[in-house]
A protein has these predicted regions:
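Electrostatic, structured charged patches in enzyme active sites and in nucleic-acid/phosphate-binding
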Residues: 1-155
């Protein structure tokens, strides 16, 4: 049984103990960094429709360009999952577990979430805003690379 361990910094992390070992195809032991990841691992492990799953098993290259300089990076999605749907068809997915404010999430009006500039323009508020925008840009580039990867690989 996996036990959520709360760290001093306020989030849960630990090794997930796989119950259905024949379904887990990852090369390394699954390590959750949040309660959301732990719950998703448990869902994959115990859901009879999940045929295979792995944790951080795929690397996708992408490039970030800042100030005219390009730097190569690699994006490692949290999960790879193969599921049998209701029509008994095999569906393959890459899954990333992220909070709402860290990704290009669309609301019900199909608008992409963008952090609002701070009302108070002090140094701390501006720094937080800058970091949120930088994270959103980086995650958008990663996920665009992931979409291309999925299209090329039939996911």
């Amino acid at each position: 049984m996996t036990v959520l361990t709360k760290k001093d910094h306020g989030w849960y992390q630990g090794l997930y103990e796989v119950v259905n070992k024949e379904k887990y195809v990852g090369l390394k032991k699954p390590f959750y960094r949040s309660s959301w990841e732990c719950r998703f691992m448990s869902w994959c492990d115990n859901n009879p429709n999940v045929i295979k799953w792995s944790f951080e098993s795929i690397e996708i290259p992408y490039v970030i360009t800042e100030n005219g300089f390009s730097k190569s990076h690699r994006y490692i999605p949290d999960f790879y999952v193969e599921i049998l749907n209701k029509q008994n068809q095999l569906k393959k997915f890459l899954v990333e577990i992220k909070p709402y404010n860290q990704g290009p999430i669309k609301n019900s009006k199909n608008e992409v979430y963008v952090p609002k500039p701070p009302k108070n323009k002090n140094a701390k508020a501006l720094k937080i805003y800058y970091l949120e925008m930088k994270t959103l840009k980086k995650n958008t580039l990663k996920w665009n690379a992931a979409r291309s990867y999925c299209q090329r690989n039939g996911l």
